[in-house]
Every structure is written in C-alpha cells, then in structure tokens.
Amino acid sequence: MSEEYYPWGGEFTTCDSKSCVAVVLLNTEYVPSDKVAIYGPLKTENIGVEKIVANTISNPNIRYLIICGEEIRGHKSGKSLVCLNKNGIDETNRIRDAPGAIPYIENLDKEAIERFQEQMEIIDLIGITNKEEIDKIIENCLEKPLPCFGDSYIAIRIAPEAAKLDDKRALHSNIIVDYLGKVKKRGE
C-alpha cells in the first residue's frame, strides 16, 4: 500500500495504486482482480460512505468507482453513495435523495464532497453479483483510463459540534425506523 493514500482506514484491500478503478462491495463475496486500486465492503450509509469518499479521493489515479452486489437492506448504502456523487448534500448534511435510514455526512466538508463528485465516475452495478459481468466492466474501465485528477486530496475529519435542540441535523436517538429500514419519524 502506498503510504500517502487511504488515510481514513477501514476494511479494504489495496492492489495497484496507479489503477483508475476502485470497487465497492455490497453484501457479496466477490473479489476483483489485483488490477484495481482498492476494494472493500460498504455497510453503512453514513460513516461507511464517508470513509469511501475520503479514501478514494486521496488517490487521484482512481477515476471509476464501481459499486456491485446486493444492496444492504435498511441502510441502502450503495444507493446513498450513488446519490452523494450525483446530488451532494443539503444544508443539514443529508445526502440528497438518498434512500438510506440515516444518510448524513457529518465528518467531511463540502470541498471533499465536491472533489468526490468531480473526480469519480460511478458505475452503478447494484444488484449485480455475477463475477464475469463485473470483471468485464472493470476491464472496460481499465482499457479506457481517465487522466490522473491532479494532486492527492487528504480530507480532514470535521470536529463534531454540539447539537442544539432546534438543530435539524440527524439526532440519531430521535429517528424512528420501521422494520424495512424506512424512516417513519424524525425528532423535531
């Protein structure tokens, strides 16, 4: 592993730091070839998404982010990552249009999110688990690499602020989620 990349840690495997492809694994045992830069699971639509963003933007060679496997029930972390790349966050740090139960980005600044949106081309293979199909998409991306995105970007973790009673951000203890993972009520 190249020491200058992937500063936020997490559960992942590094391969070729010069590769333009990173792979996010949702609920799958699939293992990509060692031609990718990094791969690993995504479990949650908040901290997990933050780590994927921070770690992938640290390597400017990564330009394609392939998300594959079956969606995580309730969390919808894969779709939340897709929505973050496409739509960003609102003024309460909620990922716009994300279907997850608690899709809030609380530890990254807007600059890191904008870098993620500009640097990454998302390849949405959510629901696809066929190894040959995923391998083919990876090979297609490797055959048409996008140029390096400039210098490495190291996202700095935002220090948490104390929440106030009238704060509209997610106060996790005040969110009621049904058994399917749908938010039924948010605290006021």
What are these regions (language model features)?
Residues 46-52, 101-106, 131-135, 139:
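Well-ordered, non-membrane alpha-helical segments in soluble/globular domains
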Residues 53, 82, 114-117, 135-139:
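Generic detector of well-ordered alpha-helical segments enriched in charged/polar residues
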